[in-house]
């Protein structure tokens, strides 16, 4: 990986970063262990929802992506929160290396991974052409020996993915095909997370991609206010939560963010109101922030918590016992 040099000296690994990420300064809080994500029996089982409260996590994107910078970005946010994230969100291309050094670092600190695994053409998958590769990925996940959330081809309802997904029926067939290969490989440590966009429930596009109750462990949505004007978290997620309420499944908000364009004080108010929505809906069992500014998106599509007003509101949420249920296992 460019910008990352690992030197082993006296059994210690020293990471030299040539493209350093300018992370926020530590708050001085004591760093505590990650609140543990529960499993049914042992660490090699799939993660299960907490009986009370909700897991809290994030994708923390550095300005310049390297493995070292990703680790530093997560570490910096955790220093400010005062404890490790229960869930660390990572993104994985269809045939990318796995696990990465950052994946292993997050697992080693006691966090659980939410792996957003990108797809390929759904009809290619169901043809069997990629079966060997899918088996390889299944063995990689199994070999971790730790619980993970696995989110295959998230936001599949987006119009710009239609040439790859083709239709809801094609997507469901590909999902079932992948799950069958994982089951045959004996992968028991992955909870399968189905995660379209929240917008897909207001425009009616998402439901056609649902694989069915027997094939999904967690129902999820990525929730961002639409471009142009102000939209609350509640108005963004309400259609999704209404749909999810008809299913006996734990709910995850896999990504959410408040645009930088709103300004510091409105962002803080938006976050505090979002917390109230989550706490009031006991079906929501995991909440993950998208702490990044994607390239070329402008202020309306940037969500990183760089201003102290919004960051303070965010930290007050992350610090609440409701979002640290693992401590009460």
What do the PLM-derived regions correspond to, one by one?
Residues 56-147, 266, 270, 276-282, ...:
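N-terminal carbohydrate-binding/catalytic regions of secreted carbohydrate-active enzymes
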Residues 10-39:
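C-terminal region of N-terminal signal peptides and the immediate post-cleavage residues
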Residues 101-111, 116-118, 221-262:
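Glycoside hydrolase catalytic-domain groove-lining segments
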Residues 63-65, 93-96, 119-123, 154-159, ...:
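Solvent-exposed loop/turn segments at secondary-structure junctions
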Residues 132-218, 222-236, 266, 296-315:
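Active-site cleft segment of glycoside hydrolase catalytic domains centered on the general acid/base Glu
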Residues 88, 150, 217-219, 255, ...:
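Conserved, mostly hydrophobic/aromatic
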Residues 1-6:
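N-terminal export and membrane-targeting signals
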Residues 58-61, 179-204, 250-261, 286-292:
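Aromatic-lined carbohydrate-recognition surfaces of secreted/lumenal glycan-active proteins
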């Amino acid at each position: 990986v460019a910008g990352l040099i690992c030197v082993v000296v006296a059994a210690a690994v020293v990471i030299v970063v040539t493209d350093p990420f300018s992370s926020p300064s530590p708050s001085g809080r004591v760093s505590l262990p990650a609140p543990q994500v529960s499993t049914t029996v042992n660490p090699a089982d799939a993660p299960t929802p907490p009986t009370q409260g909700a897991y809290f996590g994030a994708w923390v994107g550095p300005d310049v992506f390297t493995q070292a910078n990703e680790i530093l970005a997560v570490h910096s946010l955790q220093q400010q929160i005062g404890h490790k994230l229960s869930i660390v969100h990572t993104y994985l291309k269809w045939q990318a290396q796995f696990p990465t050094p950052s994946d292993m670092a997050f697992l080693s600190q006691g966090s659980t991974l939410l792996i957003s695994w990108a797809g390929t053409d759904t009809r290619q998958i169901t043809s069997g052409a990629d079966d060997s590769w899918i088996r390889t990925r299944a063995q990689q996940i199994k070999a971790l020996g730790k619980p993970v959330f696995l989110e295959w081809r998230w936001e599949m309802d987006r119009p710009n993915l239609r040439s790859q997904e083709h239709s809801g029926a094609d997507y469901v067939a590909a999902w079932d095909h992948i799950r069958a290969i994982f089951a045959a490989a004996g992968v028991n440590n992955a909870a399968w997370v189905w995660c379209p966009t929240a917008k897909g429930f207001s425009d009616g596009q998402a439901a056609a991609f649902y694989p069915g109750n027997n094939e999904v462990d967690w129902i999820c949505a990525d929730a961002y206010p639409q471009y142009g004007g102000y939209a609350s978290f509640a108005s963004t997620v309400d259609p999704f939560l209404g749909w999810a309420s008809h299913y006996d499944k734990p709910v995850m908000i896999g990504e959410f963010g408040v645009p930088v364009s709103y300004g510091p004080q409105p962002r803080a108010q938006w976050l505090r109101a979002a917390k109230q929505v989550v706490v009031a809906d006991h079906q929501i069992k995991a909440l993950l922030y998208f702490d990044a500014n994607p390239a070329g998106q402008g202020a309306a599509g940037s969500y990183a918590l760089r201003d102290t007003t919004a960051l303070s509101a965010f930290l007050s949420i992350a610090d609440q016992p409701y979002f640290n249920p693992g401590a009460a296992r």
